[in-house]
Amino acid sequence: MQPFIDLKNNLSFEDFKTEVLNDYKIAVMSRECSLIGRREVLTGKAKFGIFGDGKELPQLAMAKAFLKGDWRSGYYRDQTFMMAIGELTAQQFFADLYANTDLELEPMSAGRQMGGHFTTHSLDDNGNWKDLTKQYNSSADISPTAAQMPRLLGLAQASKIFRNVEDINTNNFSVGGNEVAWGTIGNASTSEGLFFETINAAGVLQVPMVISVWDDEYGISVHAKDHTTKENISEILKGFQRDNENKGFEILRVKGWDYPNLIETYQEAGAIAREEHVPVLIHVLELTQPQGHSTSGSHERYKSAERLAWEAKNDCNLKIREWIIESGISTNEALTEIERTIKRDIRDAKKNAWTAFLKPIQKEQQELLSLLKQVASSSVNGVFISKIKESLAKIDEPTRKDILSHARKCLRYTRGETSSEKKQLANWIDSIFENSQSKFSSHLYSETNQSNILIKEVKPTYNEDASQVDGRIILRDNFEALFSTYPEVLVFGEDTGNIGDVNQGLEGLQETFGELRVADTGIREATIIGQGIGMALRGLRPIAEIQYLDYILYALQIISDDLATTHYRTRGKQKAPLIIRTRGHRLEGIWHSGSQMGGILNLIRGVHVLVPRNMTKAAGFYNTLLQGDNPALVVECLNGYRLKEKMPTN
């Protein structure tokens, strides 16, 4: 490791020292959260834990290059980064681990996701956009490995649209398209097809993204030799490296324990992506995983003694500690005192988070104990109900399941009784379920006045001598009107641009509105949807075209796991009103019923599924969807493009 690098102009040694020590404090805080978090899971206070220990230093370097307005699309190891940009406190970390349903205390998902899934709030309490250029932005994580990659592509492409499309409204969304989309992924997950599909698409589109690969040589118990050709992802991606004649990626490598070079590498990557709109891949090598993959097991089961010894010696937190002392920035004694203070603070944060989690549940416990006492006094089964009360009272740290199971058990003992005390208990149980609706089941769809189902119907109007035209003409003319009215609307897909889609519903629109707004793509359905999700998260109104319904299976995982859950898993704090356009449902083909519709209806709850009976209906659906804020899938009738319909006047 180099002894000292001054990366900022006019930065004095004292200022540099302050910055380094602040980074060290964040690294220690994050590590201590990981260590205590694991213990909390193993003692039963949380169901599962997956943490970012061993990845602290590169995330600190990434945070220094990450500017307000930028976006993150990462995964469940990025807690240090979120702490470094000021979007995650230690107490929120534990509130997340305990799945606290109070959004004020657990702003990542209000307890809807497992720990380690991070987000920021793009919307205010009324569902209106905040100024995203004045805050650090993180799209909401999901658990499937590599599924963050398609969305990353769209987040980056939005900057290209904002920079290059005239008359587009950038207020609250962009400052000249200068925003970078930062993605993170583990080395093992680069084996997923979604990763390679995203890499290829980003190289074609030339969008400002920086992908960090955190490489600790393992994917749970499986070594890199079983994951990656040559055991090195940046080595096999060399063909994507740009040169003087061909566009592509800038590919950088850096060791994950080398603090000065990490900072330099991330500054370089950010500048390339931001200024040149060139995608960058940073392969961060020689990282460790001190506690293994997760709380599901121990890495001593599959790592050799030699590997474990190497990890202990090359732990990035240990390395920066050694470097700080060797560079004269601080002393062993001073760092020890910092560590002691932080460990005490983390213990306090954990305690406060647990107390805050328990408090409302214990309040419900006391309410129920009082009700049980009253019911027991009036019931013929009072002896048994008193035993239920005693059982509940003995639970020091109850769950809501404990409370409701005791309450409903009491109701069973009062069957046939009509006392006011029983009625009061039943009403109390109903109120708990009603309150639970907002805690656990709200915001699957928009709950604002922008919801599509609240938009007033406008019926088509016709002249007496209305001409009969092909259905595709109605679609085409309606799309032209929409594109003229809404500069933020864009459409893209296979054969969508140059020929105006395979059924000519977009005929001539690329020539009118340009290749950025009416675009062709490669054959890559998952990242077509990812483009749409990312751009919709940034305030654009994309229409992502899947050429035929049959091909939607390639993208169904992303639609189901990411798009359909965006509003729900952020409890209404992010939205991605993407419109997916496709055609089919002819009841022909290899499928026994000729349609994937049954699976679609069940797998993408959270997305409206619309099947217009003709192209006039289809046009109306698109008009309604663009006025609202829910995502939707529109399946146009494949037989309807050449059928004659009256041309509406509106």
Language-model features and meaning:
Residues 459-571, 593, 602, 609-610:
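Glycine- and small hydrophobic-enriched segments that form the cores of compact globular domains
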Residues 138-361, 602-650:
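Glycine-rich ThDP/TPP pyrophosphate-binding loop and its adjacent helix/strand module
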Residues 1-58, 64-65, 290-513:
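Conserved acidic/glycine
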Residues 32-212, 217-219, 223-241, 590-592, ...:
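Cofactor-binding active-site loop characterized by glycine-rich and histidine/acidic residues
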Residues 258-283, 331-334, 384-391, 547, ...:
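Phosphate/diphosphate-binding loops
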Residues 99-108, 204-212, 517-520, 563-583, ...:
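A glycine-rich helix N-cap at a beta->alpha junction
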Residues 76-81, 185-191, 213-219, 255-260, ...:
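Acidic, glycine-rich active-site loops and adjacent beta-strand->loop/helix elements
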Residues 41, 48-55, 75-77, 110-111, ...:
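Active-site nucleophile and cofactor-binding loops and adjacent substrate-binding regions
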